[in-house]
Protein backbone atom coordinates (compact mmCIF):
# COMPACT_ATOMS: atom_id res chain seq x y z
CA UNK A 1 0.00 0.00 0.00
CA UNK A 2 1.37 3.38 -0.95
CA UNK A 3 -0.67 5.37 1.56
CA UNK A 4 -2.42 4.85 4.84
CA UNK A 5 -5.97 3.63 4.29
CA UNK A 6 -8.48 5.29 6.61
CA UNK A 7 -11.27 2.88 7.51
CA UNK A 8 -14.49 3.58 9.39
CA UNK A 9 -15.63 0.42 11.19
CA UNK A 10 -19.35 0.14 12.02
CA UNK A 11 -20.25 -1.88 15.13
CA UNK A 12 -23.77 -2.76 16.27
CA UNK A 13 -23.03 -3.10 20.02
CA UNK A 14 -21.91 -0.53 22.58
CA UNK A 15 -20.75 -3.28 24.94
CA UNK A 16 -18.60 -6.23 23.96
CA UNK A 17 -20.84 -9.23 24.59
CA UNK A 18 -21.42 -11.03 21.29
CA UNK A 19 -18.97 -12.95 19.12
CA UNK A 20 -19.10 -10.43 16.25
CA UNK A 21 -18.03 -7.59 18.52
CA UNK A 22 -15.20 -9.56 20.12
CA UNK A 23 -14.03 -10.63 16.65
CA UNK A 24 -14.16 -7.02 15.49
CA UNK A 25 -11.95 -6.02 18.41
CA UNK A 26 -9.46 -8.75 17.46
CA UNK A 27 -9.54 -7.41 13.90
CA UNK A 28 -8.70 -3.87 14.96
CA UNK A 29 -5.89 -5.11 17.20
CA UNK A 30 -4.45 -6.99 14.22
CA UNK A 31 -4.09 -3.92 11.99
CA UNK A 32 -0.73 -2.41 11.04
CA UNK A 33 -1.33 1.25 11.94
CA UNK A 34 1.35 2.38 9.49
CA UNK A 35 -0.90 1.05 6.71
CA UNK A 36 -4.45 1.29 8.09
CA UNK A 37 -5.95 4.02 10.28
CA UNK A 38 -9.04 2.71 12.09
CA UNK A 39 -11.98 4.86 13.16
CA UNK A 40 -14.98 3.30 14.88
CA UNK A 41 -18.68 4.19 14.94
CA UNK A 42 -20.59 2.76 17.92
CA UNK A 43 -24.30 2.94 18.78
CA UNK A 44 -23.64 4.03 22.36
CA UNK A 45 -21.12 4.74 25.08
CA UNK A 46 -19.97 1.64 26.94
CA UNK A 47 -17.05 -0.50 28.02
CA UNK A 48 -16.25 -1.39 24.42
CA UNK A 49 -15.58 2.27 23.58
CA UNK A 50 -13.07 2.44 26.42
CA UNK A 51 -11.29 -0.67 25.16
CA UNK A 52 -10.96 0.86 21.71
CA UNK A 53 -9.76 4.20 23.02
CA UNK A 54 -7.14 2.38 25.09
CA UNK A 55 -5.83 1.10 21.75
CA UNK A 56 -5.63 4.68 20.47
CA UNK A 57 -8.68 4.37 18.21
CA UNK A 58 -10.94 7.38 17.69
CA UNK A 59 -14.59 6.50 18.36
CA UNK A 60 -17.79 8.38 17.58
CA UNK A 61 -21.32 7.68 18.80
CA UNK A 62 -24.17 7.55 16.28
CA UNK A 63 -27.31 5.45 15.72
CA UNK A 64 -26.72 1.96 14.32
CA UNK A 65 -30.05 0.24 13.79
CA UNK A 66 -30.50 -3.47 13.03
CA UNK A 67 -33.43 -3.56 10.62
CA UNK A 68 -34.48 -7.10 11.52
CA UNK A 69 -37.28 -8.83 13.36
CA UNK A 70 -37.57 -12.14 15.13
CA UNK A 71 -39.97 -14.70 13.72
CA UNK A 72 -43.56 -14.15 14.82
CA UNK A 73 -46.96 -15.61 13.98
CA UNK A 74 -48.91 -12.33 13.88
CA UNK A 75 -51.15 -11.64 10.89
CA UNK A 76 -49.62 -10.15 7.76
CA UNK A 77 -51.26 -6.72 8.13
CA UNK A 78 -49.93 -6.31 11.68
CA UNK A 79 -46.42 -7.21 10.51
CA UNK A 80 -46.67 -4.68 7.67
CA UNK A 81 -47.75 -1.88 10.02
CA UNK A 82 -44.94 -2.73 12.41
CA UNK A 83 -42.43 -2.84 9.53
CA UNK A 84 -43.49 0.61 8.29
CA UNK A 85 -43.10 2.07 11.78
CA UNK A 86 -39.67 0.50 12.17
CA UNK A 87 -38.60 1.73 8.74
CA UNK A 88 -39.49 5.32 9.65
CA UNK A 89 -37.37 5.05 12.79
CA UNK A 90 -34.57 3.51 10.74
CA UNK A 91 -34.55 6.34 8.18
CA UNK A 92 -34.39 8.95 10.94
CA UNK A 93 -31.50 7.05 12.52
CA UNK A 94 -29.62 6.95 9.21
CA UNK A 95 -30.05 10.68 8.67
CA UNK A 96 -28.76 11.35 12.18
CA UNK A 97 -25.81 8.99 11.67
CA UNK A 98 -24.82 10.73 8.42
CA UNK A 99 -24.92 14.14 10.10
CA UNK A 100 -22.82 12.97 13.04
CA UNK A 101 -20.22 11.34 10.79
CA UNK A 102 -20.03 14.49 8.66
CA UNK A 103 -19.49 16.64 11.75
CA UNK A 104 -17.16 14.40 13.77
CA UNK A 105 -15.00 13.09 10.93
CA UNK A 106 -14.83 16.10 8.61
CA UNK A 107 -11.05 16.22 9.00
CA UNK A 108 -10.64 12.63 7.82
CA UNK A 109 -10.63 11.37 4.26
CA UNK A 110 -12.36 8.03 4.72
CA UNK A 111 -11.39 5.43 2.13
CA UNK A 112 -13.39 2.42 3.31
CA UNK A 113 -16.47 1.80 5.43
CA UNK A 114 -16.22 -1.65 7.01
CA UNK A 115 -19.48 -3.15 8.34
CA UNK A 116 -18.49 -5.49 11.17
CA UNK A 117 -21.61 -7.65 11.00
CA UNK A 118 -24.18 -8.94 8.53
CA UNK A 119 -26.97 -7.50 10.66
CA UNK A 120 -26.62 -3.77 9.83
CA UNK A 121 -27.35 -1.68 6.75
CA UNK A 122 -25.78 1.49 8.21
CA UNK A 123 -22.41 0.77 6.59
CA UNK A 124 -23.95 0.40 3.14
CA UNK A 125 -25.69 3.78 3.43
CA UNK A 126 -22.68 5.59 4.94
CA UNK A 127 -20.39 4.31 2.17
CA UNK A 128 -22.78 5.81 -0.40
CA UNK A 129 -23.00 9.06 1.59
CA UNK A 130 -19.20 9.35 1.90
CA UNK A 131 -18.54 8.21 -1.70
CA UNK A 132 -16.09 5.57 -0.53
CA UNK A 133 -15.60 1.81 -0.72
CA UNK A 134 -17.66 -0.63 1.33
CA UNK A 135 -16.43 -3.90 2.86
CA UNK A 136 -19.16 -6.05 4.41
CA UNK A 137 -18.12 -8.62 7.04
CA UNK A 138 -20.53 -11.56 7.04
CA UNK A 139 -20.34 -13.13 10.49
CA UNK A 140 -23.89 -14.56 10.79
CA UNK A 141 -26.52 -16.52 8.89
CA UNK A 142 -29.14 -14.38 10.72
CA UNK A 143 -32.04 -16.72 9.95
CA UNK A 144 -30.41 -20.07 10.72
CA UNK A 145 -28.47 -19.02 13.81
CA UNK A 146 -30.36 -16.05 15.29
CA UNK A 147 -33.82 -16.69 13.78
CA UNK A 148 -33.92 -13.10 12.48
CA UNK A 149 -35.67 -11.87 9.35
CA UNK A 150 -34.77 -8.63 7.54
CA UNK A 151 -37.64 -6.19 7.06
CA UNK A 152 -36.42 -5.61 3.52
CA UNK A 153 -36.51 -9.36 2.80
CA UNK A 154 -33.67 -11.79 2.14
CA UNK A 155 -33.75 -11.22 -1.62
CA UNK A 156 -33.06 -7.50 -1.24
CA UNK A 157 -30.53 -7.98 1.57
CA UNK A 158 -28.53 -10.47 -0.51
CA UNK A 159 -28.61 -8.04 -3.42
CA UNK A 160 -27.19 -5.24 -1.25
CA UNK A 161 -24.53 -7.52 0.24
CA UNK A 162 -23.39 -8.68 -3.18
CA UNK A 163 -23.13 -5.06 -4.36
CA UNK A 164 -20.43 -4.31 -1.75
CA UNK A 165 -16.91 -3.62 -3.02
CA UNK A 166 -15.80 -6.68 -1.04
CA UNK A 167 -17.29 -9.19 1.37
CA UNK A 168 -15.55 -11.28 4.02
CA UNK A 169 -17.34 -14.47 5.06
CA UNK A 170 -16.11 -16.16 8.24
CA UNK A 171 -16.78 -19.69 6.96
CA UNK A 172 -17.60 -21.35 3.66
CA UNK A 173 -21.08 -22.10 5.00
CA UNK A 174 -21.74 -18.39 5.61
CA UNK A 175 -20.35 -17.49 2.18
CA UNK A 176 -22.61 -20.03 0.48
CA UNK A 177 -25.59 -18.64 2.41
CA UNK A 178 -25.11 -15.03 1.24
CA UNK A 179 -22.90 -14.75 -1.82
CA UNK A 180 -23.85 -15.26 -5.47
CA UNK A 181 -21.57 -17.62 -7.39
CA UNK A 182 -20.11 -14.94 -9.70
CA UNK A 183 -19.71 -12.14 -7.16
CA UNK A 184 -16.21 -10.66 -7.28
CA UNK A 185 -14.03 -9.91 -4.24
CA UNK A 186 -15.92 -12.42 -2.11
CA UNK A 187 -13.26 -13.35 0.43
CA UNK A 188 -13.53 -16.12 2.99
CA UNK A 189 -11.32 -16.51 6.05
CA UNK A 190 -11.90 -17.31 9.70
CA UNK A 191 -12.17 -14.71 12.47
CA UNK A 192 -9.18 -13.74 14.56
CA UNK A 193 -9.80 -14.98 18.10
CA UNK A 194 -6.53 -14.72 20.03
CA UNK A 195 -3.07 -13.18 20.08
CA UNK A 196 -0.24 -15.70 20.14
CA UNK A 197 1.04 -13.88 23.23
CA UNK A 198 -1.94 -15.24 25.22
CA UNK A 199 -1.00 -18.88 24.63
CA UNK A 200 -0.32 -20.78 27.86
CA UNK A 201 0.61 -24.33 28.76
CA UNK A 202 -2.21 -26.86 28.66
CA UNK A 203 -3.75 -27.67 32.02
CA UNK A 204 -3.34 -31.43 32.28
CA UNK A 205 -5.39 -31.70 35.46
CA UNK A 206 -8.93 -31.69 34.12
CA UNK A 207 -11.90 -31.41 36.43
CA UNK A 208 -15.02 -33.54 36.16
CA UNK A 209 -17.36 -31.28 34.21
CA UNK A 210 -18.58 -30.68 30.68
CA UNK A 211 -18.78 -27.04 29.60
CA UNK A 212 -21.52 -25.34 27.59
CA UNK A 213 -20.79 -21.68 26.80
CA UNK A 214 -22.91 -19.23 24.80
CA UNK A 215 -23.95 -15.59 25.10
CA UNK A 216 -27.54 -16.78 25.52
CA UNK A 217 -28.83 -20.19 26.56
CA UNK A 218 -31.60 -21.19 24.16
CA UNK A 219 -32.75 -24.19 22.14
CA UNK A 220 -31.27 -22.77 18.93
CA UNK A 221 -27.90 -22.67 20.69
CA UNK A 222 -28.36 -26.32 21.63
CA UNK A 223 -28.57 -25.86 25.41
CA UNK A 224 -31.32 -28.49 25.47
CA UNK A 225 -29.17 -30.97 23.50
CA UNK A 226 -26.37 -30.57 26.04
CA UNK A 227 -28.75 -31.31 28.92
CA UNK A 228 -30.43 -34.28 27.25
CA UNK A 229 -27.10 -35.83 26.29
CA UNK A 230 -25.69 -35.30 29.78
CA UNK A 231 -28.73 -36.95 31.34
CA UNK A 232 -28.59 -39.88 28.90
CA UNK A 233 -24.87 -40.40 29.52
CA UNK A 234 -25.41 -41.15 33.22
CA UNK A 235 -22.03 -39.56 33.94
CA UNK A 236 -23.49 -37.63 36.85
CA UNK A 237 -23.47 -40.97 38.67
CA UNK A 238 -19.67 -40.80 38.45
CA UNK A 239 -19.55 -37.24 39.79
CA UNK A 240 -19.39 -35.36 36.46
CA UNK A 241 -21.19 -32.03 36.16
CA UNK A 242 -22.66 -29.96 33.33
CA UNK A 243 -21.65 -26.30 33.62
CA UNK A 244 -23.57 -23.62 31.68
CA UNK A 245 -22.03 -20.19 31.00
CA UNK A 246 -24.35 -17.59 29.46
CA UNK A 247 -27.44 -15.48 30.03
CA UNK A 248 -30.49 -17.63 30.72
CA UNK A 249 -34.16 -16.77 31.05
CA UNK A 250 -35.69 -18.04 34.31
CA UNK A 251 -38.35 -20.12 32.52
CA UNK A 252 -35.77 -21.73 30.26
CA UNK A 253 -33.51 -22.54 33.20
CA UNK A 254 -36.44 -24.27 34.92
CA UNK A 255 -37.14 -26.25 31.74
CA UNK A 256 -33.55 -27.51 31.64
CA UNK A 257 -33.49 -28.28 35.36
CA UNK A 258 -36.69 -30.30 35.01
CA UNK A 259 -34.89 -32.59 32.53
CA UNK A 260 -32.11 -33.07 35.07
CA UNK A 261 -34.59 -33.60 37.90
CA UNK A 262 -36.31 -36.40 36.00
CA UNK A 263 -33.13 -38.51 36.14
CA UNK A 264 -31.83 -37.29 39.49
CA UNK A 265 -29.08 -35.11 38.02
CA UNK A 266 -30.24 -31.67 39.23
CA UNK A 267 -27.41 -31.42 41.78
CA UNK A 268 -24.87 -31.92 38.99
CA UNK A 269 -25.88 -28.94 36.83
CA UNK A 270 -24.50 -25.43 37.41
CA UNK A 271 -25.75 -22.20 35.82
CA UNK A 272 -23.03 -19.57 36.29
CA UNK A 273 -24.47 -16.78 34.11
CA UNK A 274 -22.66 -14.66 31.55
CA UNK A 275 -18.90 -14.64 32.07
CA UNK A 276 -16.33 -12.55 30.19
CA UNK A 277 -13.32 -14.43 31.56
CA UNK A 278 -13.94 -17.92 30.23
CA UNK A 279 -10.35 -19.18 29.96
CA UNK A 280 -10.27 -20.83 33.44
CA UNK A 281 -13.43 -22.79 32.62
CA UNK A 282 -12.15 -24.03 29.24
CA UNK A 283 -8.72 -24.96 30.58
CA UNK A 284 -10.14 -27.23 33.30
CA UNK A 285 -13.15 -28.79 31.53
CA UNK A 286 -13.24 -32.44 30.52
CA UNK A 287 -14.75 -31.33 27.20
CA UNK A 288 -16.63 -28.46 25.57
CA UNK A 289 -20.05 -29.08 24.02
CA UNK A 290 -20.74 -27.09 20.83
CA UNK A 291 -24.40 -27.95 20.28
CA UNK A 292 -25.66 -24.93 18.31
CA UNK A 293 -27.98 -26.01 15.51
CA UNK A 294 -26.39 -23.57 13.01
CA UNK A 295 -23.29 -21.85 14.36
CA UNK A 296 -21.77 -19.52 11.77
CA UNK A 297 -18.26 -20.22 13.06
CA UNK A 298 -18.08 -20.47 16.83
CA UNK A 299 -15.46 -18.47 18.73
CA UNK A 300 -16.02 -20.72 21.72
CA UNK A 301 -14.84 -23.73 19.71
CA UNK A 302 -11.55 -21.93 19.08
CA UNK A 303 -11.38 -20.84 22.72
CA UNK A 304 -11.59 -24.52 23.62
CA UNK A 305 -8.88 -25.48 21.11
CA UNK A 306 -6.66 -22.67 22.41
CA UNK A 307 -7.03 -23.73 26.03
CA UNK A 308 -6.52 -27.44 25.53
CA UNK A 309 -10.14 -28.49 25.91
CA UNK A 310 -11.47 -31.30 23.67
CA UNK A 311 -14.51 -30.29 21.60
CA UNK A 312 -17.63 -32.30 20.83
CA UNK A 313 -19.29 -30.38 17.99
CA UNK A 314 -22.62 -30.63 16.21
CA UNK A 315 -22.18 -31.51 12.54
CA UNK A 316 -24.01 -28.42 11.23
CA UNK A 317 -23.33 -24.82 10.16
CA UNK A 318 -19.68 -23.79 10.20
CA UNK A 319 -18.64 -26.23 12.94
CA UNK A 320 -17.52 -29.05 10.54
CA UNK A 321 -15.08 -26.57 8.98
CA UNK A 322 -13.32 -26.27 12.34
CA UNK A 323 -13.37 -29.89 13.51
CA UNK A 324 -11.67 -32.71 11.64
CA UNK A 325 -13.57 -35.61 13.12
CA UNK A 326 -11.36 -37.80 15.27
CA UNK A 327 -8.31 -35.57 14.80
CA UNK A 328 -9.07 -32.09 16.17
CA UNK A 329 -12.31 -33.01 17.91
CA UNK A 330 -15.44 -35.09 17.46
CA UNK A 331 -18.62 -34.43 15.46
CA UNK A 332 -22.12 -35.67 16.26
CA UNK A 333 -25.46 -35.68 14.45
CA UNK A 334 -27.80 -36.60 17.29
CA UNK A 335 -28.25 -36.37 21.05
CA UNK A 336 -27.56 -40.11 21.28
CA UNK A 337 -24.24 -39.69 19.46
CA UNK A 338 -23.27 -36.80 21.74
CA UNK A 339 -24.11 -38.84 24.83
CA UNK A 340 -21.96 -41.71 23.55
CA UNK A 341 -19.05 -39.35 22.81
CA UNK A 342 -19.27 -37.93 26.33
CA UNK A 343 -19.04 -41.45 27.75
CA UNK A 344 -16.05 -42.24 25.52
CA UNK A 345 -14.05 -39.06 26.08
CA UNK A 346 -13.82 -39.49 29.85
CA UNK A 347 -12.05 -42.82 29.26
CA UNK A 348 -9.58 -41.67 26.59
CA UNK A 349 -6.17 -40.05 26.57
CA UNK A 350 -7.02 -36.90 24.59
CA UNK A 351 -3.46 -35.53 24.35
CA UNK A 352 -3.11 -35.92 20.55
CA UNK A 353 -6.56 -34.42 19.90
CA UNK A 354 -5.68 -31.42 22.08
CA UNK A 355 -2.30 -30.91 20.39
CA UNK A 356 -3.70 -31.04 16.84
CA UNK A 357 -6.64 -28.77 17.69
CA UNK A 358 -4.32 -26.24 19.30
CA UNK A 359 -1.99 -26.21 16.30
CA UNK A 360 -4.99 -25.66 14.00
CA UNK A 361 -6.05 -22.68 16.14
CA UNK A 362 -2.54 -21.17 16.08
CA UNK A 363 -2.32 -21.52 12.30
CA UNK A 364 -5.73 -20.04 11.51
CA UNK A 365 -7.08 -17.75 14.25
CA UNK A 366 -4.33 -15.44 15.52
CA UNK A 367 -4.36 -11.65 15.32
CA UNK A 368 -0.77 -11.76 14.09
CA UNK A 369 -1.79 -13.46 10.83
CA UNK A 370 -5.21 -11.86 10.49
CA UNK A 371 -4.04 -8.30 9.84
CA UNK A 372 -2.24 -9.37 6.65
CA UNK A 373 -5.46 -10.82 5.28
CA UNK A 374 -7.35 -7.57 5.92
CA UNK A 375 -4.56 -5.67 4.12
CA UNK A 376 -5.05 -7.87 1.04
CA UNK A 377 -8.80 -7.16 1.03
CA UNK A 378 -8.29 -3.41 1.37
CA UNK A 379 -5.54 -3.25 -1.25
CA UNK A 380 -7.71 -5.18 -3.70
CA UNK A 381 -10.64 -2.83 -3.08
CA UNK A 382 -8.57 0.35 -3.36
CA UNK A 383 -6.87 -0.89 -6.53
CA UNK A 384 -10.27 -1.83 -8.00
CA UNK A 385 -8.91 -5.29 -8.64
CA UNK A 386 -10.19 -8.77 -7.96
CA UNK A 387 -8.51 -11.39 -5.85
CA UNK A 388 -9.36 -14.27 -3.56
CA UNK A 389 -7.36 -15.51 -0.56
Mark where each language-model region is.
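Conserved donor-binding/catalytic core segment of Leloir-type glycosyltransferases
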Residues: 7-8, 203-221, 227-230, 243
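A conserved mid-protein helix/loop that constitutes part of the nucleotide-sugar donor-binding site
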Residues: 18-26, 217-232, 254, 302
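Glycosyltransferase donor-sugar binding loop
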Residues: 41-47, 213-214, 241-255
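Donor nucleotide-sugar binding/catalytic pocket of nucleotide-sugar-dependent glycosyltransferases
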Residues: 60-63, 158, 162-198
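Nucleotide-activated donor-binding/catalytic signature segment of Leloir-type glycosyltransferases, i.e.
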Residues: 255-273
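Aromatic "clamp/platform" in nucleotide-sugar-dependent glycosyltransferases that forms part
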Residues: 274, 293
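Short hydrophobic beta-strand element within catalytic cores of glycosyltransferases
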Residues: 310-313
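Conserved acidic donor-binding segment of nucleotide-sugar-dependent glycosyltransferases
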Residues: 325-326, 330-336, 344-350
Amino acid sequence: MNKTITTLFIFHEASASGGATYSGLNMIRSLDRSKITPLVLLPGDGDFKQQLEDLGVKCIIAPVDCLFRTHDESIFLVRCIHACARFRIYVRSLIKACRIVHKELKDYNIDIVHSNTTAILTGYVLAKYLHCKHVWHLREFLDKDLHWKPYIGFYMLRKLINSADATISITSAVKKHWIYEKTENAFQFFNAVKSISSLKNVNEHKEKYFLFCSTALEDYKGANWAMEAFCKSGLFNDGYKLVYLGNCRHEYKQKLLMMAHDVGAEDYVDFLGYCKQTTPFFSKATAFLMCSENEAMGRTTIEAFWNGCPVLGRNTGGTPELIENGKTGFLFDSIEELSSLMQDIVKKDNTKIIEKAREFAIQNFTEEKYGKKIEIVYKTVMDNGTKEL
